[in-house]
């Protein structure tokens, strides 16, 4: 029985994922998926997407530690980590996951604030007179 480790990232969220063959148990920050989410169905589907696409929701156990960012970024980091772990588990899953963009790191992050501006691009109000 081998244990596969993968890391998923999104914005400032980082997910460390361990995947082992098992009965379909999902543990995030030592809580079940429903406890961790608090009933957000859309976010739950986002996390479960790679498992549902590869039909592995009942045959692998996943233990994950997620930190940084908000719930949505954490869920997407978790999805990225699970996808990378499934790819390492069976290379045949790559043909399913790659076209859906689940193995690609979403590199969009918040643009930094510049001096002389109110935000990253928002300038102070301009007055001609």
UniProtKB/Swiss-Prot annotation:
GO terms for molecular function: RNA binding; structural constituent of ribosome. GO terms for cellular component: cytosolic small ribosomal subunit. Pfam families: Ribosomal_S9 (PF00380). PROSITE patterns: RIBOSOMAL_S9 (PS00360). One of its GO terms (biological process) is translation. NCBIfam families: PRK00132.1. This is Small ribosomal subunit protein uS9. It comes from Helicobacter pylori (strain P12). The gene is rpsI.
